[in-house]
């Protein structure tokens, strides 16, 4: 029975180039899609750029472009990656397309009519200089849990804490450096806490193998409430205030859908765009409209995603679809991240970053990487580690040494001695070997279906070992010199080519370009899994051309070579002229405690600080940090000050020292002012040496 599948990968955010994590996911999904096509199924494989949100709006403004043009320019570079790594999307679209506007608003109305949308007034940070509400990631400040500086408004990269932006200490706008103010605004919430949603999601996440067991275990945590009734599913804020680049919420002027509401709907929008362009009709003779197709219970819907976006795809997305009257996914396939050298996080500056375009520009074969990634992938949520030495070994030993060599060891004899024609009488041993290879077809199709690509490739290479054992046992190079052994030589070489064809069928989902070369060499129609049970017989093949080069280890050195670092001025300015230690020792730096902080009337920049420097009295110091700190947030903090600076008479009084703070030389380009704080344990009066 022919299956009909709708397959997607996570939508990349349209503010930058693809990274290796994107390519890994596309390769994983593409292998599965190509396998399904080779099994004779109808697959609609679509992608799109995630085009909305404040980050894109702000990046476009900095680039002097409209958001639409900014996104279009990013999208124009996608094809180089997708073609380069043989990713076979049927359609690539954008969440800013008219289809997504229509679908997002339609789905929202259905949720609203179902009583699952609620309007609430909330307080959120507003940048008075930019005149806009700030997204969580554009608010920075001190972590409310551990006190780490310069953390984002929703989570701490130091201690891992998650919090709301209003909990951040000493917040500032990452856009302007201004201190944000709290303003009230009506926001629209999807009531995920509604008992109907909770009941449905409890059922959906546990039925029919929709999720991997590791994912189910994680989802259970999100359902769980503590002894005080806290936790469990929370309502989802799906709105953002103008100015915002996104889709307007119906009947709510100045309100836009949060990007995570319309982004997954972009899966449907890309499919609709594909249908509207006539793609399925041209490819499969599909006569139905998008609406008819997507409503068909027999249509299977699959999403490949990274583990970092599991929450959205296993809770919000199925609930959004179900309660808007739409079909939910059959499966959400979650994968891990890509690391390098036994789990090290990738970093371009350290020379541990794998740049996909650099890989291609070095002339490295895309199918080396496809094979290597596939060999590491399984159906679990595990990270994939790229080890350069392992990469060279697997490609050279497996692909070239075991698989390609089979054809090269036989094709020359067939061409020279038999005009390229295969024998139809393959002998008992040869037939037994080929039957062994054919018998693995169902095992391999089961492994591909289950996304156990690593196991599948180990099976194939095990079969390649058997073929090479057959070659070594029969020694065609000796048969070619032996008088009267032509018939045996013909049979042995024909068995090798037939075995090579079977192995190529089994590898074709992973190595489509190489398979196309093999099809040309064998002079056969495109290979499918159904052909594994058929033999070529007395068939004439073409002349053998070299199919794949070995990996030169020097290419890996070049791939991971750190980019040349441009000479830059640290902090935006040259290091000051060199001084002697005696000069530095003249400056007396001391720890001080801020006893009191208050604004200075008539000054936009100054705060009046009352400091305890451990002298038995307090000092009065004026500091130009008003734009970065609220007075009430400074009281009780420990700072570093210049204690032996001569008192200076100012318009507002006498300043008895200087508080140390850091900033970039160009504060407009890189805003932010950061008072220096000592580690816990320092006390007033301690000298900084």
From Swiss-Prot:
The keyword Transport does not apply. Belongs to the class-I aminoacyl-tRNA synthetase family. MetG type 1 subfamily. It is an enzyme of class 6 (ligase). Residues 583-689 form the tRNA-binding domain. It is found in: Cytoplasm. PROSITE patterns: AA_TRNA_LIGASE_I, TRBD. A motif ('HIGH' region) lies at residues 12-22. Its main location: cytoplasm. Binds 1 zinc ion per subunit. One of its GO terms (cellular component) is cytosol. It comes from the Bacteria. This is Methionine--tRNA ligase. It catalyses: tRNA(Met) + L-methionine + ATP = L-methionyl-tRNA(Met) + AMP + diphosphate. Its cofactor is Zn(2+). Coiled coil: none annotated. HAMAP family: Met_tRNA_synth_type1. ATP binds at residue 348. SUPFAM superfamilies: Anticodon-binding domain of a subclass of class I aminoacyl-tRNA synthetases, Methionyl-tRNA synthetase (MetRS), Zn-domain, Nucleic acid-binding proteins, Nucleotidylyl transferase. Its EC number is 6.1.1.10.
């Amino acid at each position: 029975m022919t299956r009909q599948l709708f397959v997607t990968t996570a939508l990349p955010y349209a503010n930058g180039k693809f990274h290796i994590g994107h390519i890994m996911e596309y390769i994983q999904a593409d292998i599965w899609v190509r396998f399904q096509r080779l099994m004779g199924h109808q697959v609609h494989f679509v992608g799109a750029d995630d085009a909305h949100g404040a980050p894109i709006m702000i990046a476009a403004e900095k680039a002097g472009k409209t958001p639409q043009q900014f996104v279009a320019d990013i999208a124009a570079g996608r094809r180089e990656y997708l073609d380069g790594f043989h990713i076979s999307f049927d359609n690539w679209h954008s969440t800013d397309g008219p289809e997504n506007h229509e679908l997002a608003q339609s789905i929202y109305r259905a949720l609203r009519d179902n009583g699952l949308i609620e309007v609430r007034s909330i307080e959120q940070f507003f940048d008075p200089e930019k005149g806009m509400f700030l997204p969580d990631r554009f608010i920075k400040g001190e972590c409310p849990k551990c006190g780490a500086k310069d953390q984002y408004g929703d989570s701490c990269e130091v201690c891992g804490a998650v919090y709301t932006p209003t909990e951040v200490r000493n917040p500032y706008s990452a856009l302007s450096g201004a201190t944000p103010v709290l303003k009230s605004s009506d926001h629209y919430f999807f009531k995920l806490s509604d008992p109907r949603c909770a009941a449905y999601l409890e059922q959906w996440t546990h039925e029919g193998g929709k999720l991997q067991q590791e994912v189910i275990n994680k989802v259970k945590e999100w359902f769980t409430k503590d002894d005080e009734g806290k936790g469990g599913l929370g309502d989802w804020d799906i709105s953002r205030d103008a100015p915002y680049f996104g889709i307007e919420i119906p009947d709510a002027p100045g309100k836009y859908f949060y990007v995570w509401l319309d982004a997954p709907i972009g899966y449907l929008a890309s499919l609709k765009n594909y249908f509207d362009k006539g793609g399925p009709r041209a490819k499969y003779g599909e006569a139905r409209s998008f609406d008819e197709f997507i409503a068909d219970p027999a249509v299977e819907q699959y999403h490949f995603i990274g583990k970092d976006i599991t929450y959205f795809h296993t809770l919000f997305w199925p609930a959004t679809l179900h309660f808007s009257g739409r079909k939910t996914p059959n499966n959400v396939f979650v994968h891990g991240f890509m690391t390098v050298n036994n789990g090290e996080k990738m970093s371009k500056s350290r020379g541990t970053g794998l740049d996909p375009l650099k890989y291609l520009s070095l002339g490295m074969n895309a199918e080396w990487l496809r094979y290597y990634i596939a060999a590491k992938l399984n159906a679990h949520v595990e990270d994939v580690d790229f080890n350069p030495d392992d990469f060279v070994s697997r490609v050279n030993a497996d692909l070239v040494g075991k698989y390609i060599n089979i054809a090269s060891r036989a094709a020359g004899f067939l061409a020279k001695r038999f005009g390229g024609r295969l024998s139809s009488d393959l002998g008992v041993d040869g037939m037994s070997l080929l039957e062994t290879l054919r018998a693995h077809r169902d095992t391999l199709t089961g492994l591909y279906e289950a996304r156990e690509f690593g196991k599948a490739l180990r099976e194939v290479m095990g079969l390649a070992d058997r073929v090479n054992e057959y070659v070594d046992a029969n020694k065609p190079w000796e048969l070619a010199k032996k008088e009267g052994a032509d018939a045996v030589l013909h049979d042995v070489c024909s068995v090798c080519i037939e075995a090579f064809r079977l192995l190529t069928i089994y590898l074709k989902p992973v190595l489509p370009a190489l398979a196309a070369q093999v099809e040309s060499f064998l002079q056969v129609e495109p290979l499918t899994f159904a052909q594994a049970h058929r033999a070529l017989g007395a068939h004439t093949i073409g002349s053998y051309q070299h199919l794949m080069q070995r990996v030169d280890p020097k290419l890996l050195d070049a791939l991971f070579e750190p980019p040349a670092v441009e000479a830059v001025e640290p902090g935006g300015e040259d290091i000051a002229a060199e001084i002697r230690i005696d000069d530095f020792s003249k400056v007396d730096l001391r720890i001080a405690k801020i006893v009191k902080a208050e604004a200075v009337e008539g000054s936009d920049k100054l705060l009046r600080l009352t400091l305890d420097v451990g002298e038995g009295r307090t000092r009065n110091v004026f500091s130009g940090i008003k734009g970065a700190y609220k007075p009430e947030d400074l009281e009780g903090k420990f700072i570093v000050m210049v204690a032996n600076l001569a008192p200076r008479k100012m318009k507002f009084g006498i300043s008895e020292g200087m508080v140390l703070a850091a900033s970039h030389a160009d504060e407009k380009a890189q805003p932010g002012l950061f008072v220096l704080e000592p580690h816990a344990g320092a006390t007033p009066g301690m000298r900084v040496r």
